[in-house]
Amino acid sequence: MISCGARLAVFDIAELREVTAYDELELDTLGDRKTALFLIMSDTDDSFNFLISMCYTQLFNLLCEKADDVYGGRLPVHVRCLIDEAANIGQIPRLEKLVATIRSREISACLVLQAQSQLKAIYKDNADTIIGNMDTSIFLGGKEPTTLKELAAVLGKETIDTYNTGESRGRETSHSLNYQKLGKELMSQDELAVMDGGKCILQLRGVRPFLSDKYDITKHRSEERRVGKVCRSRWSPYH
């Protein structure tokens, strides 16, 4: 009882009780039509971060039930969850099972982390299961040793040709030439740590990892429309 009381003590705050007293998000409707829902939390105070985790838990459960009971197993509109700073919202219960089952219901989850070790710190042994159930992973850069080590292993090795020449001098001069093939890491840990900031490494299921340029978001059509509106709103014939 003491442990339960300590965990629920946060609901002694009247404002929090008011926020959670009624369902105003209608999470079960997200797969019915195109909708954007933003869950924003403080990046300096994690006291209420568990609310985000609760929302995702309810979201996955409600949408899976609706997909099965109403739409025959697949939602009419794909629901994509972009979970930025996923390590800061706490643990989403049964995430290792959810990431493997929600995809068939037209639901996907994109976990954004600073380092792979963050996921292991929260989900322990289940972290590898979560990573293994992700069809796509992208490395944007970083220096965390565990991430670099595992990525270097995934990239594999390339074959290089080496030639060694030797010369000995004495009464008679002799020369030697040795040729052999060696395996070299495609990108070593130190190379990954200093990777160009404009590059990324993308891994797709069934495809070998490849190096690619990061997308310039300023060239996206929605960004061009936004900038155009800002420019028009600031224009004045008297300038």
Predicted features and spans:
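Short, glycine/acidic-enriched loop or turn micro-motifs at the edges of active sites
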Residues: 87-88, 117, 232
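P-loop NTPase motor domains
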Residues: 1-107, 122, 190-214, 220, ...
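H-loop/switch region of ABC-family ATPase nucleotide-binding domains
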Residues: 113
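Positively charged, low-complexity/disordered segments
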Residues: 224, 228-239
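P-loop NTPase motor core of the ASCE superfamily
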Residues: 28, 34-35, 97-100, 118-226
